[in-house]
Amino acid sequence: MQAFIRAHGIILPMNQDHVDTDAIIPQRWLVTVERDGLADGFMGAWRYDEHGQPRPECVLNQPAYQGAAIVLARENYGCGSSREHAVWAHQGYGIRAIVAASYGPIFHENCLKNGLLPITLPAADVATLMAQALADPGCACEVDLVSQRVIGPDGRAYPFEIDAGRRQLLLEGVDDIDLALARAADIAAFQRRQQQDQPWLA
């Protein structure tokens, strides 16, 4: 997993509540179990019409937002069904972090496990950032995990909270599999002890 220290980039504003995982990555892009190749499916139903042509009104198709790295959203972002593809689609598109007022809980956990930083800010702060992003298309902000701050387009700093353990794993680029492999010797020792002490479980 790629370590996350800080990210600076164009803000991609998703100016509505309850953006669900079906909107983030529609079902027809779920035919793979690979992480790669999902960039085209990111917000696919919004980006393309029924003929597969780009919808010009969608922010993802507007020149100012090309190369965006930080999604800005409102309430309950990533709600709906559980699908890691929703996280992988963000990453495939180039998104490093999300700033929102709240999240679907499963999506939030999947983000943390896959190295996509989900930041929660008060709704009033999100509204301020959203107004700036919409007034100045293509403006950028910075997310700093070390100092736990979002730096808005105007230079204002917004502090955020994150679980200390998850923060450390993100800073080190360590996922759950890496963590288990690092403790392989301890796990093997536990299994041996358990077989000796509780052989009926073998």
Swiss-Prot record:
InterPro entries referenced in this protein's UniProt entry, alphabetically: 3-IsopropMal_deHydase_ssu, Aconitase/3IPM_dehydase_swvl, AconitaseA/IPMdHydase_ssu_swvl, IPMI_Swivel, LeuD
Gene Ontology terms, MF aspect: 3-isopropylmalate dehydratase activity
SUPFAM superfamilies for the chain: LeuD/IlvD-like
Keyword Cell wall biogenesis/degradation part of the UniProt annotation: no
Record bears the keyword Acetylation: no
Any Pfam family matching the protein: Aconitase_C
Reactions catalysed, as given in the entry: (2R,3S)-3-isopropylmalate = (2S)-2-isopropylmalate
GO cellular component, one term: 3-isopropylmalate dehydratase complex
Keywords: Amino-acid biosynthesis, Branched-chain amino acid biosynthesis, Leucine biosynthesis, Lyase
Pathway given in the UniProt record: Amino-acid biosynthesis; L-leucine biosynthesis; L-leucine from 3-methyl-2-oxobutanoate: step 2/4
Known partners and oligomeric status: Heterodimer of LeuC and LeuD.
Alphabetized HAMAP family for the sequence: LeuD_type1
Similarity comment text for this entry: Belongs to the LeuD family. LeuD type 1 subfamily.
Described function: Catalyzes the isomerization between 2-isopropylmalate and 3-isopropylmalate, via the formation of 2-isopropylmaleate.
Protein name per Swiss-Prot or TrEMBL: 3-isopropylmalate dehydratase small subunit 2
UniProt source species: Bordetella parapertussis (strain 12822 / ATCC BAA-587 / NCTC 13253)
